[in-house]
């Protein structure tokens, strides 16, 4: 069955889907990390692929930018294609002073300025948290790989060019590790659908210091994050 935004056939997606924002990043993951990967969807050029990693079937698909786009794809994957787990893999800007460029952050919870989860949760505040099983496996995978991963709260912003930069003072006070644009929505959709979600991020720039990574540095650290995610999928 196809949906308005996904034209894959039934059974095309694995139980677990990696979800970068950029569809070309999804293609990169499929070509460089998955074996025998095949493209399964391409509506609006939002590419999706399925292959295997260490013998286990895994899919990867882009989400686009922001909570609305990510929520559409996550809902359709969970509801129409039998996907059980979505792991977002992406970049973020750091606000905490002790977070460095290229650090890996695992989002235990996701605060947000979006009202999407309030709409979903009948006007109340919803605690948008990762699925514990996925979180535990990712932490263990990072430890086994010798990669230091920071675990904590992240912030999903509705605006990239914020008109209120003073918000970063508040985020730093509350020990928010990084800022991105999708996780809170993904966690809300997973809860609504009774499924599982996790967000693993690489720090691409530091909002407080103005530091930025080069494209080569982003690629290297992004690969570390991907291996954590993939190894967590095949963990028993």
UniProtKB/Swiss-Prot annotation:
Residue positions of the active site: 205
Taxonomic lineage: Bacteria, Pseudomonadati, Pseudomonadota, Gammaproteobacteria, Alteromonadales
EC number(s) stated in the UniProt entry for this protein: 2.4.2.1
The keyword Transferase belongs to this UniProt entry's keyword annotation: yes
GO MF entries: purine-nucleoside phosphorylase activity
Swiss-Prot/TrEMBL keywords: Glycosyltransferase, Transferase
PANTHER family reported for this sequence: PURINE NUCLEOSIDE PHOSPHORYLASE DEOD-TYPE, URIDINE PHOSPHORYLASE
GO CC list: cytosol
UniProt keyword Phosphoprotein, yes or no: no
Protein name: Purine nucleoside phosphorylase DeoD-type
Assembly: Homohexamer; trimer of homodimers.
InterPro entries in alphabetical order: DeoD-type (IPR004402), Nucleoside_phosphorylase_CS (IPR018016), Nucleoside_phosphorylase_d (IPR000845), Nucleoside_phosphorylase_sf (IPR035994)
One Gene Ontology term from the biological process aspect of the record: purine nucleoside catabolic process
Annotated PROSITE patterns: PNP_UDP_1 (PS01232)
Pfam families (UniProt xref): PNP_UDP_1 (PF01048)
